[in-house]
Structures are given as C-alpha cells and as structure tokens.
Amino acid sequence: MSSRTLYDKVWNFHQVKELPGGSTQLFIGLHLIHEVTSPQAFSALNEKKLGVKFPNLTVATVDHIVPTSNQQRPFSDPLAEEMLATLEKNCKTHGIKFHGIGSNSQGVVHVMAPELGLTQPGMTVACGDSHTSTHGAFGAIAFGIGTSQVRDVLASQSLAMNKLKVRRIWVEGELQKGVYAKDLILHIIRHLGVKGGVGFAYEFAGPAIEKLSMEGRMTICNMAIEGGARCGYINPDETTFKYIKGKEHAPKGQEWDKAISWWKSLASDSKATFDDEIQLDGSSIEPTVTWGITPGQGISIKETIPNPEFLPKNEQQIAKDACKYMNLKPDEPIEGQSIDVCFIGSCTNGRLSDLEEASKIVKGNTVADGIRAFVVPGSQKVAKEAKEKGLDKIFLKAGFEWREPGCSMCLAMNPDKLEGRQISASSSNRNFKGRQGSANGRTLLMSPAMVAAAAINGKVTDVRKFLKE
C-alpha cells in the first residue's frame, strides 16, 4: 500500500531531474505574474535574447500598484502607469494572456486565478509573490518566488528546488459561530510561531479543515507563509471539485472525468508518514486579533495583551518592542482598543464570502464617527457578484467606501495608505511595521467580520455580540 503524502506525489510527478548539489529541477505547471516582480525578469530575458518557454502556462494580471478609487488610464501616479504599461508590452511581446484594467477577470492574482479555474489539484504553481501558497487550497504545491526565479520560470518553465519536510496540522472539531478561517490560521501561527514552519510544507487536515469552504481554505493556505512554511496545502475533495467544475479553464466532458479520477488519487495516503504532526481543537478557537508586529503575536478577543516579563526569554524583547510600537499596554484587554481605519480586502480575505459575512454585521448599522472604513473586492468577478447581491449598497449605506479591485491597503504600493500613527483593523495578512504605508502606522489583523464590527463600534469588538442580535 502506498504511504506517500500529497506533497510527495506532486513533487515526484513534476520532477525533471536531480541537479548537482542535491536540488531538483521541478517543472512548474502554472506561472502567475504581475506588474511588480516581472519587469526585471523580462529585462533579463531580453538581455540574454531568450524567449518565454511556454507562454500558455503563464498568466498575468495587475493588482499591487493599481489605484482603487479611480482606475482611469493613465494613472495619476506615473510610476504605476509605467509599471502597468511595461507589463502590457511584455505580455504582448511574448504572447502571454493578460487580465488587465478593463478586463472582467482582472483582480488580485491569488483571487482571480482560482476564479478562472486556472488553479487545479496536482499542479505546481509559482508566482513572484509571497502569498502564492494560497493555491495549495486546491491540493496544489504553490511557491512564492523572487524576481530571479521569475526569470528562470519564464525561460525554462522550471525551478531548482530543495524538497521540504511535511508537517501535518490536524484540526479537530468545528469552528464556532463567529469564528472564521482567518481566526483559525492566526491561532495556528500563534501556536507554532512565525518561524515554526521553516523548512516545511504544511498539510492542513482534519474535520475542521474539511468543513471549510474553498474560500476559507484559501485563507488558511494564504497565510501558511506567515508561519514560516514554504507552502501549505489541503487534500482535494468534493468541495474542491464542486468549486472548479464549470469554470473557464476547468476540464470539460470526458477530460473532467479523467481529471477527477487523478485528483482523487492525489490525497495523502492513510498510511502516509509525516515528518511532524500537530493536533489542535478547532471548536475551542475564539475570534482572534493580532496585537503586535508579527502575525504570530495574536490573542483571542477575550485575552489581554501579553506581559513580556512572563513570556519565554527568546520572545520577551520582541514583545516589548511590539508593545512600544503599537502603544499598547501589557495586561490590558485587546477588546475595546480604539481604531482609526477599517480595511476589508486583500488576497487573504477579499472574496465574495468574506464580503458576505462582513455585510451581515454591517447591515442596519452605521460606521462610528471618525472611522474611515472601506471595502476592496479582490477581483472584478467578486465586485460584480457582490453588487448583484446588493452588498455594495449595504456597505455604502453604513458609511463604508466601496472601491475597485486591487491589493489596496494590504501593502504600501498604491494610494491606499495609513497616515501617521493611525491604527487599522485589517483583514489582510501582515502587520509588520510600516506595512500599510505609514512608517509609524499600526495594524491589527482579524477576520472581515471582526473588521466590520470594529468599524461599527470604533474599537476592537467581539463579532459574536452582533450575531446574537
């Protein structure tokens, strides 16, 4: 009987050859590119007079630098306009499909690719973006890569990689009402640490994982990188197949039946051996909020800010630095902390179900005085479907701004930024110093529904209070 993990199976299937020094040449089945990490890669190809090996296996979109308030061309930021124009030119030159401004399929790369059915079980996926691990939700092995590796994939459709160890994170039970995939992954990162996954691929499994929707699974895998893992994945199942079926790039007819048969064979075998295994109880997890400057510095809504003096010695200094930077006092509750800005969006939580859950909290309420709150759909498709459901009107009526798709305030590469010492309640994935555009800006990570609750009350709030009403 086979005793292999999904990671083993996908790795072996895409292995081209062993390289001197012990690494492996790995074929990449899907290469996603955007405007930020691709220009230098294309320049390197041009210098060496190389073409793109398999243009049909590369797909491009624009997301990081696009303004979300006005996407009329040319952009008011000349650098952003230049980056977009460069990507357009490179895609045209090399015959790469580009989902650009004005396209009904444009969006944040890790949102739009799954929507189109581009991401499928058993694939290897690469993109010049840290959160490429998102695609592991489909039973793919997905890596974020640097610019030089983007060049290598364009030129050869392969990468030199070292095989990872595999840690299975088994989550028992079922998430409570008001607890979401974002809370679960923040809890996992808190438990294992931001460096706990170094050298590992994370396999997320167990009843609590299996009960998640595909969009929830994408949230989980999206943030595997924040726990130090090189990638994260979930075994494909009927939930996966139902999501993919009928999408533009999904197999059709007899090819669909063949694909299903193969996809089912990919799941880790019952006798598979893992390098490490962790078991958690999903039913005990509460709404979770970060208080510090790493995604691992998270606590449940009912806890207080940790006192650095009572933490392990290797965590004390960073906790002290975090408290000072965030202007939060040890032993004070996180619930009730005031906020200035609320952001719902990003490749972590900018999908339709995220907006739906947040809208349930917002409906019939009003954004608190002095709070700036905005919603940024993850793609044109998300925006269209949200409008069809009337979600935009719910948010607008409550006092939120409704924006065009893009990465927005997840990172400081477009006009959506914090100012000065503002503190945000954000559904994004990173709370590093300066991450949201101001060198002194502060970020509290939480689920979209928790962000919505914070916007209504003007402070960190247990979303479950709204769900009881």
UniProtKB/Swiss-Prot annotation:
Pathway note: Amino-acid biosynthesis; L-leucine biosynthesis; L-leucine from 3-methyl-2-oxobutanoate: step 2/4
Lineage: Bacteria, Bacillati, Cyanobacteriota, Cyanophyceae, Synechococcales
Protein name: 3-isopropylmalate dehydratase large subunit
Cofactor(s) it depends on: [4Fe-4S] cluster
Family assignment from sequence similarity: Belongs to the aconitase/IPM isomerase family. LeuC type 1 subfamily.
Quaternary data: Heterodimer of LeuC and LeuD.
Cofactor: binding comment: Binds 1 [4Fe-4S] cluster per subunit.
EC number: 4.2.1.33
Organism this protein belongs to: Prochlorococcus marinus (strain NATL2A)
Record's signal peptide: none
Recorded superkingdom: Bacteria
NCBIfam families recorded: leuC (TIGR00170), PRK05478.1 (NF004016), PRK12466.1 (NF009116)
